[in-house]
């Protein structure tokens, strides 16, 4: 089976993480869409493993958590009338927990917006931290049980509850209602009110929408398969944490957090992809039967 050179595959992965759609990459790089999809699936699986292995023992002071909306195949409100909609069509939520100082994505989760998803995120977050932290979230009620279950009393936790004005008219439904104020609510421990904020994680939500085409609103670049959506988030997370230079830090978030000493590259990821998928070993050729002439 033919395989693209490593440099070509690395460029495809980079373009996926810089906001290009799969079909746009296929056109610009003169490859098939299936080739781009296979590169995403192979690398995404490895990136998820690398995140689990490398983002451990994180020493953070302040963690901010939030969830960002996207959809698979069609939006939730149109699932009932959509043609040939798969069983997992509808809204998808990506949960993230970010170190406010190093900007490291400590934990992420692709799922729904249920209490169970919040529990899984917080359990994962707790397993990667080495010390007591201050956690800030929005007012989503699912966080209350999740933080309590994962951290017990060993956490300083507060919620930032935003107060909004009237909802925009249907014509302006993509314009959010005006935020008229915020309320900081202490939930557990002794959180420092000065650092009770979700500003960094909300800013990162915009970064995610800019870097992953399937998160961009009002386009047809949305996900068509939940599995590929999860692979893209895993690919982006490793890219953001270990490969991409953060514009303010002048290094990667992983380096700032002290869990990496140098930059990684997609060549490193592809080396693991190739190691996990070695080429088939051909058997010996021959012997052949002697050809009998007419």
Model-derived segments and spans:
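Residue-level recognition of single "structural anchor" positions
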Residues: 1-294
């Amino acid at each position: 089976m033919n395989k693209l050179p490593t440099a070509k595959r690395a460029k495809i992965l980079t373009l996926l993480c810089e906001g290009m759609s799969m079909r746009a990459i296929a056109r610009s790089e003169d490859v098939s869409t299936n080739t781009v999809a296979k590169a995403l699936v192979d690398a995404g699986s490895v990136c998820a493993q690398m995140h689990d292995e490398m983002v451990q023992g994180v020493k953070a002071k302040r963690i901010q958590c939030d969830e960002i909306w996207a959809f698979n195949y069609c939006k939730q409100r149109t699932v009932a009338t959509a043609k040939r909609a798969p069983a997992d069509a509808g809204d998808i939520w990506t949960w993230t927990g970010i170190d406010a100082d190093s900007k490291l994505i400590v934990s992420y989760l692709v799922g729904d917006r249920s209490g169970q998803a919040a529990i899984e995120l917080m359990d994962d977050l707790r397993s990667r931290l080495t010390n007591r932290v201050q956690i800030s979230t929005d007012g989503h009620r699912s966080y209350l049980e999740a933080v309590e279950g994962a951290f017990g009393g060993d956490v300083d936790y507060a919620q930032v509850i935003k107060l909004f004005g009237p909802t925009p008219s249907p014509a302006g439904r993509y314009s959010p209602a005006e935020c008229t104020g915020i309320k900081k609510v202490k939930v557990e421990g002794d959180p420092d009110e000065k650092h009770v904020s979700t500003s960094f994680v909300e800013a990162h939500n915009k970064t995610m929408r800019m870097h992953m085409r399937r998160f961009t609103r009002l386009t047809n670049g949305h996900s068509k398969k939940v599995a590929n959506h999860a692979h893209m988030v895993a690919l982006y997370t490793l890219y953001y944490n270990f490969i991409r230079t953060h514009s303010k830090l002048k290094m990667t978030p992983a380096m700032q957090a002290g869990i990496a000493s140098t930059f990684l590259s997609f060549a490193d990821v592809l080396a693991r992809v190739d190691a996990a998928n070695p080429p088939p070993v051909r058997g010996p050729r021959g012997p052949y039967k002697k050809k009998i002439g007419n």
